[in-house]
Amino acid sequence: MPYATNQNVRIHYQVEGEGLPLVLQHGFSNSLDTWYERGYVDPLKHDYRLILIDARGHGASDKPHDPEAYALQLRAGDIVAVLDQLHIAHAHFFGYSMGGWIGFGLAQYAPERFPALRTQHGASAAGLTEGPHAGEGSLCGRLRGAVWGFDAAAKSPRARQ
């Protein structure tokens, strides 16, 4: 199995086909196998050199225990590390869900490497303060409060009726 390394984290990837390089990045709790299972690889590999990547924490890639190891800039760096190992200067990108979020990171941290970038159902990182210590005023803090509030409301006796 091929791996690239970014800051001591091994990132698993696979390459299929020939043609223009196209990175496919899966969503949260999936792996690169998702692209095979959903039938994307066979029709696309005739026109593209598909670079399928297991995001850090997923599939056969390393799973660091430190929450800071999952910062958007590091995740974008993982994609760049794979491309560098393959000696690919520019690639198109498609990511969905968490993969779409990683795509926003590529647009921010490595725009010169991606002439075309497409995301589906990815959350924009605009206004997001990352990390476990995001303040209540940040988007992350407000979302956390909303989720915790929903959870508490769902556990109330009235909500269970």
Question: Where are the regions that the model predicts?
Answer:
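Helix-rich cap/lid subdomain of alpha/beta-hydrolase
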Residues: 117-161
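Active-site acidic short loop of glycosyltransferases
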Residues: 6, 17-20, 46, 84-90, ...
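Glycine-rich, phosphate-binding/catalytic loops in enzymes
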Residues: 38-43, 67-70, 110-111, 134-136
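Conserved HGGG/HGGXW glycine-rich cap/lid loop of the alpha/beta-hydrolase fold
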Residues: 7-63
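Short, hydrophobic/aromatic-rich segments at coil-to-beta transitions
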Residues: 1-3
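Short aromatic-enriched loop/helix-cap "lid" or pocket-rim segments at secondary-structure transitions
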Residues: 37, 62-65, 128-133
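Active-site loop/oxyanion-hole signature of alpha/beta-hydrolase fold enzymes
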Residues: 42, 52-94
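Conserved hydrolase catalytic core segment
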Residues: 89-128
